[in-house]
UniProtKB/Swiss-Prot annotation:
Lineage of the organism: Eukaryota, Fungi, Dikarya, Basidiomycota, Agaricomycotina
Enzyme category, top tier: oxidoreductase
Protein name (record): AA9 family lytic polysaccharide monooxygenase B
Family named by the database record: Belongs to the polysaccharide monooxygenase AA9 family.
Biotechnology: Lignocellulose is the most abundant polymeric composite on Earth and is a recalcitrant but promising renewable substrate for industrial biotechnology applications. Together with cellobiose dehydrogenases (CDHs) an enzymatic system capable of oxidative cellulose cleavage is formed, which increases the efficiency of cellulases and put LPMOs at focus of biofuel research.
This protein's encoding gene: LPMO9B
EC number, UniProt record: 1.14.99.56
Species name: Heterobasidion irregulare (strain TC 32-1)
Keyword Disulfide bond appears in the UniProt entry: yes
Positions annotated to bind (1,4-beta-D-glucosyl)n: Y39, D224, Y226, E229
Disulfide bonds: C68-C189, C111-C115
Length: 244
């Protein structure tokens, strides 16, 4: 029932929105938060999600926008942050998602202070969840992205229970690889205030910059799945998952 008002708003926006999709809302430990509405002015919008302007993909893994999507700016005084305890579940909801081939990745970054003033490309990101090729082959197997679609265009993960309290940005990313050697990155960011935890922080080996974590030389980025139809292995790009 929560989706109806926002879906109605999205239906009034530009025709481009018919392609691809994006995160329209979050559920954090059972509390619902509407996201930013793209193709609309940020004036009057107040949300935990960082601004993003288009459903179009980022196709260059070194693009400056890859941390939090095209624009990716905070909403200034209208920007919110959701308070959530370490160990809580987080669900992101996409309004639509047509692609089923590719990995789903979830990152976080400690802002070291108020995230509203943070520059996301300067943060150090760590991965808390990823699902790539679950079973089968590259072209006909089950992918994380396929699981997202099957689960009503949603993805649920948990904030590491040991994570130190603080101000964080949560980043969901879909990497669509259905077009040969033309990766499509779809990142979305939201601001959190994490409470509780056990004071743990990921070691340096788990931290990356965005851009900086990916390149076209990565086998999981620059890939032609149709030339390897019987392949049953896929290497998810980026760092290993930090589980706390």
């Amino acid at each position: 029932m929560f989706l109806v008002p926002l879906l109605a708003a999205l239906s009034l926006s530009a025709p481009k929105v018919a392609a691809h999709g994006g995160v329209l809302a979050y559920s954090l430990a059972g509390t619902w938060y509407n996201g930013f509405v793209p193709y609309n002015t940020p004036t009057g919008q107040s949300t935990i999600q960082r601004e993003w302007d288009t459903y179009n993909p980022i196709t260059d893994p070194t693009d400056a926008s890859i941390s939090c999507n095209i624009n990716g700016a905070s909403l200034g005084s209208a920007q919110k942050s959701a308070t959530v305890a370490a160990g809580s579940s987080v669900t992101a909801y996409w309004n639509q998602w047509p692609h089923t081939i590719g990995p789903v990745m979830v990152y976080m970054a400690n802002c070291g202070g108020d995230c509203t003033t943070a520059t996301t490309s300067s943060l150090e990101w760590f991965k808390i969840n990823q699902v790539g090729l679950v079973s089968g082959t590259l072209t006909s197997g089950t992918w994380g992205m396929g699981q997202l679609v099957a689960n009503n265009n949603s993805w649920t993960t948990s904030i590491p229970s040991s994570l130190a309290a603080g101000n964080y940005i949560l980043r969901h990313e879909l990497l669509a690889i259905h077009t040969s050697n033309q990766p499509q990155f779809y990142p979305e960011c939201a601001q959190l205030i994490v409470t509780g935890g056990e004071g743990a922080t990921p070691p340096a080996s788990y931290l990356v910059k965005l851009p900086g974590a990916y390149s076209m030389s990565d086998p999981g980025v620059n890939i032609d799945i149709y030339s390897h139809e019987t392949e049953t292995n896929y290497t998810i790009p980026g760092p290993a998952v930090w589980q706390g």
